[in-house]
Structures are given as C-alpha cells and as structure tokens.
C-alpha cells in the first residue's frame, strides 16, 4: 500500500524574497573574498617597487546611513571596503603596510532592494544558456554543434548535407574545420582522417600555419585581422577562438559530461582536442549514434542572479584598479622618497563601477512599489533580456512558449504583456536557485514506507524520467487509491498513471504558479489569459485609506504580507512598554533594556503611493516571538488587503456598463470606500557657482502675495499648509547677468574699475502644478558640496493627496475583469436587493461567458454568503481534487446556510441558484429576470483619471510642422486625426473643423492674428495661404523628385470630352 508521510514530510513555503538575499549573501561571504585574492601582486617595470593586496583579510565597514536614512537623505546605502596592502621598495629595503580604502559597495537591504541616491532599485535575475556544447538539427538537414562560452558568445561546427565539416562564426561567414585546426598549430598527423576526408578542396588547404591563419581570416571576412597577420603585429587566432571563448568552470564540466572527457575543471580555455572530439560526436549524431539536445530545456540554462552580476562588476573594477596601480607606481618612481600607499590605490574604480552598474544596468530596475505584492513579484522576475541574452526582436516564438521542463520552476501564466510576452517571466512559489544557477523545485517523494517520506529538491534534468503526480486529486492513504488512475508527468509528457507507478507528487496544488497567480481564488475556472490579466492588475492596485481583507482568499495572503517587509513581527518574546504613531518601545524577556522599533509614517514610495505602518499592540501587552505587532499600508491583521468587498450585480443598466464600463454607487465616495492616499515629491535646487547664484528667499518681486502666503521666513512652504495649483512651494531667485547694462561703455568701464558684475534676477520658484493640490506633510533640506557643481542645496517638498474614486478611474477584480467608471448614481437610484440593500457596482454580464473567467461568479456568490454569515474563506485553487464540482457544491451549500441563518429564502432559490430578484431604485419595479448578485473583491488601480486627463489652451509647438507637441508632461495637445475629422463631418461642424485644422493647429500666420482679433473684439479672420505642415509635405515630395503645382480651374482651360453614352 502506498502512502505519503504527512507528518515527517511537512513543507514550509520559502521566503519569497530569499532568492535576492541568498544571492547577495553568497557574494559578500564567498565571491568577494575569492576575487580579491586573485588580485595578486603588482610589480613595477624595473622590479624596484612591488604592491601586494591581502584580499583575504578584507573588511566591510558599517554603513554611514541605514536604509531609511539613505532614502531620507537621498543617499546611497553602501559600505566601505578596506583591505591591508604592502608596498615594498626593494632597492631601499622599505616596506609599508597599511589598510587601504578600496571603494564603496552598494548593500542590499533586508527587503532585497538597493537604495541608490534615495531611490529603491531591484536587480532582476537573468536566464541564459549554460556554457557548453549543444547538438541540433536544422530544417535544412544541417547538423550543428554550438559551443557557448561563459560570456555568452558562441560559434558553431556544422556538418552539411554533403558531409563536409565547417566552422561558422557569425551568420554569413564560415571556413573548413581543417583550416582552423591547422591555424591553431595542429600538425596533419595529429588530425583524424575523418576530418581530412570531410573537407572540400583539400589541396588548397594544405598550408603552413601562417598561410592558414591568413586564409582563415579571409574566409571569415576579417580584413583587419588579415592585415595584422601580414604585418606580424598580433596573432588573431588566440583573440578569435581562445580568449573570447573562455568556457569557465561550469562550461568545462558540461563539456566533459557531454563528450565524456576527463579534462581538469580548471582548464577553462577551449582546446583543439575539444574541437576534434566535438566534430567526431557530430558525425556520430548524423549517423544515428548519440542524441540531439533541446536548447530550450531548462537543464541547458542557468540563472545569472545578483551574485554573478556583482562578481562580474567587481572583476572589471579590479582590472581598472590594476591599471591605476601600475600608473601610480610609474609616477612614484620620480618621487620615491614620498612613497605612500594612499597615493597608489585609487578608490574611484570600485565605487564608480558599482554605482554605474546599479544605477544604469539594464537589469537594475526602478522598484515597483505600488503595493506589497508588486514589490514581491518584481523581485521574483526572471528575464531573458539583457547583456548576453535576447532582445524582444530576436526572441522567437519557440523561446517564448511554455516548455515542459519549466513545470514547478517558471510560472506558465504570469508574464509580461506585449512584446515582452514569454521573455519576462516569474519564479513559482516553490522554486529556488541551487548551485551553478540551476532552478530547483521541491517535490514530495512517494514511497512504500510512510516513515521515509520527505521533501527533496530536484534539478531540471533529474525529474525528466521521474513520474510526478500533478496533485489534481486528493491523496488518501488507503488501499482503494493504489490502483486509481491520476494525471501525472513523465518524460516531459502529461500522462495518466496508477498510484503504484507514482514516484513523486507536488508539495502544493499551486506548485506550478507564481505569487501573483496563487492569490486568485477559483483559479481553475478561469481562462489562462484572464488569469494573466488578473495577476498583473493585482500589482497595479492602490492601497486604500480604509482597508479590508477579502472574504474569499487562497490562504497565501499572509505569506505575501510577511515576506514583503511591510508588516513588523516581534524578533523575541517581550513586553510592550510604549506605543505611538512613530515607534514601539518594548522590554525583552529576562532583560531590563528598553528597545525601540521605528515605524513608517506616511512615507512616499517609488510609485507615489503611501507607505505607512500602524501598531496593533497595546501598552503592557506581552507578545511572543514572531507575533505581529504592526500592520502595513496594505495589510489587515497580517493579511494582504488591496481592495474592498463590494456588492456587485451582473446586469445591463441603461447602457452605462457597455464595453466593460462600470456603474458605481455614490456610497463609495461619501464613505471613503475607495479613497486612496498619494504622496507627490517636488524638488527645488539652489546652486552657488562662479557663473550664477541661486537664492532661496521669500521676497519674490512681481508675484502676487496670495501665492506666497504659505512661505515661511526661509522661503520654503510651511508644514501642514494646504496648497493649490499655482502656489509657491519654494521661493527662488536666480542671478543672471543683466544684458541691458553691458551695451554702454560707461557701465563696462565701471565694472572693470570696481571689479563687480551687473546682475539681474529671474523668478525660478517651485510652484504647485496643475492638479497637484494637497497637504504639505514634509520638507527636507539636503546639502551637498561638489567641486564640479559647487555648493548645492536641494529641497524636497512632499504633498499628500486624498483621491476619491471618480468617473474615469479604473477598477478591476482578481479574474481579469476590469473596467472604467462611467457614471456615479445616487444610492436611491441604484438597484437594490429584496432586503433593501442597494448594490455598489453594476458590471456587464457579457464580460463573463466570452472571456471564460467563471471564477469571478464563484467568488462573488461565496462572498455574498460570507457577508451574511460573517465568515472568511481561504480556499486553495484546484479544489476539484476533493471531488467533481467541488466549487459549485461549496458555494451552493454556503448560500443555503446563509438563507437558513438569515431567514432570507431569496439568497438561495432552487429554481435559479445564485440569482435573485432585484428592484429598480428609480421606479421600485422588479427587473424582468433574476440577476447574479454577490460580494466581489474589487481593486482601484493606479491608472487614475487625475493622472491621465489633460487640457491645453496654448503651449509649445513643434519647430518643423508648427503643430502642438505631444504629451501631457510637455503641455502638449492632441492632434485631430482622421477619425476625429469624420466625427466633426458627421455633425456638420464645418467651421469648427476648419479652425482645428488651420488656426488652432499649424497655420502660424492665422494663429498669431487670432488673439489680436479676440482682444479687439473683431471677427477672427479666415486663414490665407497654406499651413506649415503642407509646406513640409511639399518639401519632402520635392526631395523625392515630385513637383506639386496648382492651377485655377475654369471653363476656359477645361478639356471637353465627348459623351460616350451618346454612342
């Protein structure tokens, strides 16, 4: 009898941010020491001076700022790197030993992020092909052996249909393999006859080594290398095939395993013997001996994570440091008496390299902090893009598609939308990275002895020949299940096997999905496309002012909240001493020391949402280790809470929910159901340089006193002030040289005599932009001194905005059901239930059947029952393993229980279960058909109308076309296109259309005359002549040799043609 050890085989979900933290810890503890040890000794050219770095004794200093202070001061969260070094003067017998400063290294915070100049950033892991050799067969019948090096470069050995062996570098250049071996210096007697026989025009290739090198470079179309050989400058074969194609330790191991070689793993360069063995195996594969490789299999790929990327950057920085030390030693030879270690070592190499890497590297991205879920998902992304990887244009469909080896490792649902679909993916909840960058997954081992069941971690290649149950049915340890047929995976195929043939099973039903997808209840009832949209839109949900956890969830909400770092748990057993809005004071057990925990208090995130923490403990309360003591800005009792449980009805209402539009109740506004807080930051900078002086002051000439009313004596807005559009936040005057005084000779002479400059002032105040009104909650002064930029004062003003839901805002559910608010109805006009409760939202019923996301119906009905029973449900997806129609049975049973408890029989009507009769709030009449009503968990997304809507009266114009520029940020205007012209034509608004296309667009002369006519009270004159855009078109056609001309048409110059109908 087969069974599964449920007690000894307990499985705990890994920390969702552990991939980032473990990788950086590996860099600090292992790779950093290894790279510093390789730095070695640097000797001067004349062997007099010698520099040696003791890298194994390195030391990292405690950071100057912690993470929160770095954000507050707009600084970098980093640590200074020190190491002892020797400087030896052999001629004089002097040895200097000193601990030198090598540079600063950015540190990862406890949340898995980097803080660079006050901005949180995240480094995305990259999926690359593992170095080694791979055999494939093309559509044209050409067998190929692709050799991939450690840096991502590759070249190919080809066996064409005629049986000839070639080496190909790039797409369009190839040469015989025999020619390459001769150029590498291999004698003919050591080259196997098989390679010689498979070479065309053999007589032309029997050359000496130097001639072979020239011929090889010509065939590979390398003219520059050919010239270098002829001049005897360098050997290009080493720089072409040996140095760039460094296999590395992993590549050598893979090559040894694939070709059955016994070469030391420290032999990291490609050898000529490797090419001979690789070509021999290529011929065997063409004869049916051996096997081809699936290049898209995960066993042939590796993850390049934070530690690998930092190690590459450190290697580059140490090479720069090596060059700098050599240069400084040469300079020191002339003044050897003043020899010092500080003048030899330059700290700019490491600091500059790491800063540029974290600040501008393609995979170092601006952290998405819309909500805690978006932060977690961003840290668990896996990208095929980046240096050494693919681009959206070169990524084929086969690369983007789902591969069976990704089962349990890469989520098949959550990916980017658009051109990055299938290229940017996410790790599953059970995936973690092992040695050499392989993605592991956790599986339960099924065995005959229940005492031996345990969880194991499997590499991508290890589970290929294993039988894995996909957890679609409930596992019960009895004899009746021994011969039960269940779905399973075997040899990259999904098959049906008996229980006695199963070797492993999943640890969770959602074993194969990512964090964002697991949060969708009733996931198995949704189409994959809608599940993708639902998981992506959860990351766009805005934290609300009044939080509410979902009635229907999956049970992963608490894990997401805990791993996101937004909640605070007790690190030890203690007693709470004092609690306020900014900190929690506690006394540990068996101690009398008073410790403090600082809380976030209305801090701004990267996406302008509010970061805030609320204590949930009281003074005198005793808490245990791991107990929750503070909630975050999007959590309730330690569970993720991004939306609200609102009463929804699926029905049409006067066309206002046409095409996914949403009709909402005004209660959502008055009761702040969907009110959110947003914090905008505005920056003003004052510099003091030799060219100009900028002054922060309250005395601003030519400005109305009303817009300066909130400034204090220093010229900065006061805390707590309510500011509106146009109000001055920071008063600033910029001194500029007055041009009017320089035209007279007397003023120039006076300036030369007195040595003073004539300056004027310019108003450069920081003002509140359009739709930027709010409450000032913080003002921060940051002072920096830079020898290039001079003395700088930076002022950050933070304004808190309270945004209620309004027409144009976007709302969405967890099942991809999204829409835009089209109208807000009074609560008395909304449809209401039989108990008199008006619904909160009216959704379109057409959004369910065609999109196949039936999970939202199960969710809203179960939410309705939970609302009346005051219960919360945590249901893991794929509950069909408990039996057929398990979801429907559960929902109907809970609805029946709610109807019995509340004595409302209409909650569950047997004739139409899940539906009830609604009444029209305007007339009081009942609707014709029963309507599906329930409580759905709906979000308000960050795509808000306040950030999208834009109006323009006048503004900048493009220089060439003289049309309004594009974009809200540039105060641009929307062009009237073809469809807009049709709309005006349909209404017959000819004069309006004529103005839009000429005076208000690109007719510069008419545009200048229109304001004068309006001011003087005259009629706006009609435009005369053509517009500038037509002139641009004429010039472009003339460049193509096409001349446009115009002629007045009249009866005199029109040609009369005979009427053909008369014939």
Swiss-Prot record:
Name of the molecule in the record: DNA-directed RNA polymerase subunit beta
Transmembrane segments: none
SUPFAM superfamilies with a match to the protein in the record: beta and beta-prime subunits of DNA dependent RNA-polymerase
Keywords, alphabetical: Chloroplast, DNA-directed RNA polymerase, Nucleotidyltransferase, Plastid, Transcription, Transferase
Cellular compartments per GO CC: chloroplast; DNA-directed RNA polymerase complex; mitochondrion
Similarity remark: Belongs to the RNA polymerase beta chain family.
Main location: plastid
Phylogenetic placement of the source organism: Eukaryota, Viridiplantae, Streptophyta, Zygnematophyceae, Zygnematophycidae
First-level EC class: transferase
